[in-house]
Amino acid sequence: MTGPATVEPELPELHFASGLPGFPDARRFVLVRLGDEASPFSVLRSLDDGTDLEFVVTHPALFFPDYEPEIDDDVAGRLELESADDALLLVIVTVADPVAASTANLLGPIVVNRHTRAAAQAVLGNSGYATREALVPT
């Protein structure tokens, strides 16, 4: 489904204290690069028993250089973010065929504290961002 992925995780284990929306029991994940080092995509893979979850993700700045979501104080507090530099942002990608038709969920970015590896999926209300933004403009 997602293709071959390297075995070495990019980051140590990530912890989602509340799971992901729709998947409350999926709390432990690793981020694994999809393809070679030049690939802009990774797989967010669940480590929890009974959850066979994988999401293709990417760094939004690679495709959306002007993307600057405002993470609300609740999410920032739960993740103990002291500054914007503490946060790693990822967006979930829906891979299409052809790949040029793939989309990214800019409305629900994954926010990771770079220091503690605490993570959450933020939901950006009234932001103007969409759940299916084209990766490649048409």
Go through each PLM region and give its residues:
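Short active-site loop/helix that positions an aromatic residue
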Residues: 73-83
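Long, compositionally biased stretches
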Residues: 1-66, 84-138
